[in-house]
Amino acid sequence: GMGFVVGTLLEEGLAHADILTVWDGGFESYSREPGVDGDGDTLVWRDPGPSGDNDMLRPASAPFQADGGMRLVEGTLGRACFKSSAVERERWTIEAPCRVFDTQRAVNEAFTRGELDRDVIVVVRFQGPRANGMPELHKLTPALGVLQDRGYRVALVTDGRMSGASGKVPAAIHCTPEALGGGPLAKLRDEDVIRICAATGELSTTADLSSREPAEAPPPETGMGRELFAMFRAGADGAEQGASAMLAMAGL
């Protein structure tokens, strides 16, 4: 389907056809798809034609959402990204007590014990650039998806990173400022009520965090070369600035 996607972006003027790529012919050549001719021996490139399934691929002139699939949410817990593209509209707003964890492993252990079988917002903190290098948190979605399928209203809040792994579960990710260094997530406690709303751009808690001390970060994991990158973690910028030590040192 990539040929169709590139083609519709070019048709709507949302991409430049003449940019140079690793392939001959510029970006426009990516709007064609490979195949074989009738005898099955010769590679040919052809126009992909219209979408074969409008539930999966649509032209840019008739998008799934006219205003895109990302939302900025912000409030007393900081600023975060909410990927709304695969989340049902009735789940754009979640308000529930939270459970606070410092690792993916702890979340899945609590899920296995049945401790998350309720309406809950799972907070996974100390996953930001300076805490542990902001790894991909791909192990969270299966458990949260199961809880959602059981009828519970669940969501995720984290200063960690996810790409497309959030899927159908409401998730406020890349939260900044991160918990390490005293960000708001470090002051949350179990059962604090959190509200996430992609429609209004809200990420807040009813708890008064002003008088609380931030939780201590867990000791960093060691081995597999992590020690070599400690200096980069210590000097990294926040997620909104690129989460990069090199860019930070260059003042970019």
What spans do the regions from the language model cover?
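Catalytic or ion-coupling anion/metal-binding cores of large enzyme and transporter domains
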Residues: 1-153, 157-178, 183-252
